[in-house]
């Protein structure tokens, strides 16, 4: 099954809902960064939330999420675009902890329970929108829920889950975001709160093979949900050799000549996708000649 996202309304417009399958997306991130189990879960949850938050934007708008906790995983960075493209990385991918007796990974131990979630939105204005909230649990779903309440004043529920196999490969990933719209009735809010208390963990629902639509039906009730749009989502990095060449050219002739003199081979590393671009002395000479 391919990864895709669903945008929906529920309860006659009182609730805005997003749901996504990110199994392939998170698998690609795990493959590129060689993340261990708990790191995979933390990065996967962040990518999943970022994918849905990116889908709230329009056109060529994009956002960056930084989760900076006090845990050993270090900062998590995610870039997400309105078109469903997402990329991300963890600073220390080789972090893992024993799970609970129920098999749940202790993501909070990797992320940390103190720090901040920062969201930077590039929405075409002169200055980007920057929102920030403290980490409240380190489990990430609760942290993004709190972010929406504090920074965007939008009552929300964020559920994100990643299932990881013993060999570190990703079995399933996905999640949902529910947002209460202004004027929603108390009965609607109470109904959703009650359902959220009763449903299994998101990762369990995903493991059962539920599609994004079925995930929303499980949370809200099939008769309450009206799907508006679906869109493909994927791990996609914007880096390329041509872009790296442009960055090198921007350094100027003097610095490029110094690089050519000092380095047999120049390597540029993209943190987001882990690609490495190598430039020989001859490559650097060609760049200098094109200045």
Curated annotation (Swiss-Prot):
Annotated keywords: Chaperone, Cytoplasm, Disulfide bond, Redox-active center, Zinc
Claim: Flavoprotein is one of the keywords in the record: no
Molecular function in Gene Ontology: protein folding chaperone; unfolded protein binding
GO aspect biological process, one term: protein refolding
Disulfide cysteine pairs (residue numbers): 237-239, 270-273
Localization in the cell: Cytoplasm
One Gene Ontology cellular component annotation held by this UniProt entry: cytoplasm
Pfam families hit by this protein: HSP33
Domain of life: Bacteria
SUPFAM superfamilies for the chain: Hsp33 domain (SSF64397), HSP33 redox switch-like (SSF118352)
Chief location bin: cytoplasm
Modification note: Under oxidizing conditions two disulfide bonds are formed involving the reactive cysteines. Under reducing conditions zinc is bound to the reactive cysteines and the protein is inactive.
Annotated family: Belongs to the HSP33 family.
Function: Redox regulated molecular chaperone. Protects both thermally unfolding and oxidatively damaged proteins from irreversible aggregation. Plays an important role in the bacterial defense system toward oxidative stress.
Cited PANTHER family: 33 KDA CHAPERONIN (PTHR30111:SF1)
Protein name: 33 kDa chaperonin
Species in which this protein is naturally found: Bacillus cereus (strain G9842)
């Amino acid at each position: 099954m391919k990864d895709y996202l669903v945008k929906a309304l529920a309860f006659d417009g009182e609730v805005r809902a997003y749901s996504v399958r990110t199994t392939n997306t998170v698998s690609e991130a795990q493959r590129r960064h060689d993340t261990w189990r708990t790191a995979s879960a933390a990065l996967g949850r962040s990518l999943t939330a970022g994918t849905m938050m990116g889908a709230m934007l329009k056109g060529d708008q994009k956002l960056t999420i930084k989760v900076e906790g006090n845990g050993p995983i270090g900062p998590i960075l995610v870039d997400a675009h309105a078109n469903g493209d997402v990329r991300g990385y963890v600073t220390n991918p080789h972090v893992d902890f024993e799970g609970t007796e129920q098999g749940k990974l202790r993501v909070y131990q990797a992320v940390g329970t103190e720090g901040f979630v920062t969201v930077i939105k590039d929405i075409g204005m002169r200055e980007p929108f920057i929102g920030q909230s403290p980490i409240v649990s380190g489990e990430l779903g609760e942290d993004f829920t709190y972010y929406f309440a504090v920074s965007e004043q939008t009552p929300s529920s964020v559920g994100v889950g990643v299932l990881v196999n013993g060999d570190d490969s990703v079995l399933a990933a996905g999640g949902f975001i529910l947002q209460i719209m202004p004027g929603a009735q108390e009965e609607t809010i109470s109904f959703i709160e009650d359902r959220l208390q009763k449903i299994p963990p998101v990762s369990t629902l995903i493991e059962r093979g539920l599609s994004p639509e079925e995930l929303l039906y499980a949370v809200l009730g099939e008769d309450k949900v009206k799907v508006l749009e679906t869109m493909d989502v994927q791990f996609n990095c914007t880096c390329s050799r041509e872009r790296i060449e442009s960055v090198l050219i921007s350094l100027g002739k003097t610095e490029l000549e110094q690089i050519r003199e000092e380095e047999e081979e120049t390597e540029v590393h993209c943190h987001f996708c882990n690609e490495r671009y190598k430039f020989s002395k001859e490559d650097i000479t060609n760049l200098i000649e094109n200045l």
